[in-house]
Curated annotation (Swiss-Prot):
HAMAP family registered for this protein in UniProt: PyrH_B
GO molecular function: ATP binding; UMP kinase activity
Official protein name in the record: Uridylate kinase
Pathway named in the protein's UniProt entry: Pyrimidine metabolism; CTP biosynthesis via de novo pathway; UDP from UMP (UMPK route): step 1/1
Keyword Kinase annotated: yes
InterPro entries reported for this sequence: AceGlu_kinase-like_sf, Asp/Glu/Uridylate_kinase, Uridylate_kinase, Uridylate_kinase_bac
Gene name linked to the record: pyrH
Stated role: Catalyzes the reversible phosphorylation of UMP to UDP.
Species of origin: Shewanella putrefaciens (strain CN-32 / ATCC BAA-453)
């Protein structure tokens, strides 16, 4: 375990799954989970970390099932994008209530609701200590919020994409189904592909690999895990170009 008192990263892109925001509710947003995440983000801001956030929309809407039932995929994806805006509004409000300056930017114009995404302005806001929430994915159908997280992370020149999930890292198998599944502390991009490990969709993962963007998978439901990741402590699974031996 590292005893480094200084943060390992200075600018991050935090990807939160929409499903994890449900907490025990089963649907929608659990206010307790939302407020806890806002407090954890506040801790990072107080450490001087520049934080960009992308939130999924699976707690409110999933277009895949409706697409299989006959709905046009583009329509379903547009609905999914709007679900991420709803989550973004909730997170911005939670941050404001925690006395954290935050700005919500959408990849699709929503005048009067949030700002349009602007790369240069986003970086300026991050440098000034504001949290920037990126909503509506990439603005294009057929692109996941994982792709949006990697894209925004690359654009804002983040040092790492932190992917918050419901498990505490990457395992050799599904730990929920296989108690013998082994957790990896660190992997290379090539090992992920060779072992066919599920981290994120291939388009998002390839984008991160091609731009040498590290990905760190951790359990967003574990209190204090986010801070531990930032401080370089043993938490989650780090994926990067080459393992350090």
């Amino acid at each position: 375990m590292s005893t480094n008192p200084k943060p390992t990263f200075r600018r991050i892109l935090l990807k939160l799954s929409g499903e994890a925001l449900m907490g025990e509710e089963g649907f929608g947003i659990d206010p307790k989970v939302l407020d806890r995440m806002a407090q954890e983000v506040k801790e990072l801001v107080e450490l001087g970390i520049q934080v960009g956030v992308v939130i999924g929309g699976g707690n409110l809407f999933r277009g895949e099932g409706l697409a299989k039932a006959g709905m046009n995929r583009v329509v379903g994806d547009h609905m999914g994008m709007l679900a991420t805006v709803m989550n973004g509004l909730a997170m911005r409000d939670a941050l404001h209530r925690a006395y954290v300056n935050a700005r919500l930017m959408s990849a699709i114009p929503l005048k009067g609701v949030c700002d349009d995404y602007n790369w240069a302005e986003a970086i300026s806001l991050l440098k000034s200590g504001r949290v920037v929430i990126f909503a509506a994915g990439t603005g294009n159908p057929f692109c996941t919020t994982d792709s949006a997280a990697c894209l925004r992370g690359i654009e804002i020149e983040a040092e790492v994409v932190l992917k918050g999930t419901k498990v505490d890292g990457v395992y050799s198998d599904d730990p929920m189904k296989n108690p013998d599944a082994v957790k990896y502390d660190e992997l290379s991009y090539s090992e992920i592909l060779e072992k066919e490990l599920k981290v994120m969709d291939l388009a998002a993962f390839t984008m991160a690999r091609d731009h040498d963007m590290p990905i760190l998978v951790f359990n967003m439901n574990k209190p204090g895990a986010l801070r531990r990741v930032i401080m370089g402590e043993e938490e989650g699974t780090l994926i990067r170009a080459k393992k350090v031996i």
